[in-house]
Amino acid sequence: MRVVILGSGVVGVTSAWYLSQAGHDVTVIDRESGPAQETSAANAGQISPGYAAPWAAPGVPLKAIKWMFQRHAPLAVRLDGTPFQLKWMWQMLRNCDTRHYMENKGRMVRLAEYSRDCLKTLRAATGIEYEGRQGGTLQLFRTAQQYENATRDIAVLEDAGVPYQLLEASRLAEVEPALAEVAHKLTGGLRLPNDETGDCQLFTQRLARMAEQAGVTFRFNTPVEKLLYENDQIYGVKCADEIIKADAYVMAFGSYSTAMLKGIVDIPVYPLKGYSLTIPIVEPDGAPVSTILDETYKIAITRFDKRIRVGGMAEIVGFNTDLLQPRRETLEMVVRDLFPRGGHIEQATFWTGLRPMTPDGTPVVGRTRYKNLWLNTGHGTLGWTMACGSGQLLSDILSGRTPAIPYDDLSVARYRSDFTPTRPQRLHSAHN
């Protein structure tokens, strides 16, 4: 089958890889000059299935009001003048109760855990290298309340069979030795030993090269004007004076998916602006071993080979990509506070990207009412974590194979008022 994939970020490229491996003739189209040039370029670098959770959580509406008056707030909102933004925020608020949070987190963890398994299989099969580490992730708590609240997420981890360790402050240095100097600032942490890290852009570029060698065609520097459709199917992609035709089409344009699908399929994917710093390491012993998540500021600090990646924050501001100095100062403040000897901050590279977010935090993966149009978008801050699983899942569905995990509650159909999902199976039962 001829398949056109729109988008060459980590989600688009993994989709291309798995579809090609399934025997399809795949073409990837992107306006950029190469893969992973936008949202996948400089994300936080963490592959953290157990920490997969929606921003829409109990208490967030009240916290958002408080954050409006804080200099280093993890979330900021500025009206962009569109009704879509208001509708999206209203939908997000409706998901901020405990029932929706647990439901959304459960399916996010399900996909993320599966994705990590797919990444391991891919790594073993191809030998792909991307400065990856399998050292786990440590979420740090600065208050007793945060430590206490961790029990809510632990229930989901236990249900999914995700190994975890709840650590008191005195034990944090056992897994991250550099934290010994700042343990007095912390109340404890939640460690997920099976989590991983890695350079998402490097992974995407190398997998794209492997995919090309396997027969995938990449059409870079090719802006897409619109999808052409008639009745219940897509019949082409208009790119300038050219119409590119295929048997099936996959939308993986991230935050730009919503506009490209206007009038075709209504999907609630909105750009969530985030920032990162990439810092050269000065003293390896003063840098993190793997990934640290600061629960207070919602910032991740990740170790690559000779660099530290500091990323996080969320701005609901539309498609604005201005680099704001106060956001850089927040990233610098957190990394200096936790790893004062780790990196040469003055030589850091400052970056911003737009994460494609749904109101419930769960990506949109699967078929649409158009028989040859498929979606793989809306992964928010977890595109790197969920990319391989989403790509394999999409390939299985499109190819008519039975996927390894339940998936109907990942489709766009879940936003219909009459949608009733099949109850997902329990993944595992063991934990430590």
UniProtKB/Swiss-Prot annotation:
Gene Ontology terms: cellular component: cytoplasm; plasma membrane
Keywords of this entry: FAD, Flavoprotein, Oxidoreductase
Gene symbol of the encoding locus: dadA
Disulphide bond pairs: none
Protein name: D-amino acid dehydrogenase
Keyword Flavoprotein: yes
Known role: Oxidative deamination of D-amino acids.
Reaction equation(s) it catalyzes: a D-alpha-amino acid + A + H2O = a 2-oxocarboxylate + AH2 + NH4(+)
Residues annotated to bind FAD: 3-17
Gene3D superfamilies: D-Amino Acid Oxidase, subunit A, domain 2, FAD/NAD(P)-binding domain
Cofactor(s) listed in the protein's UniProt record: FAD
Keyword Acyltransferase: no
InterPro entries: DadA, FAD-dep_OxRdtase, FAD/NAD-bd_sf
Pfam families in UniProt: DAO (PF01266)
Pathway the protein contributes to: Amino-acid degradation; D-alanine degradation; NH(3) and pyruvate from D-alanine: step 1/1
Family designation: Belongs to the DadA oxidoreductase family.
GO annotation (BP), single: D-alanine catabolic process
EC number: 1.4.99.-
Enzyme class: oxidoreductase
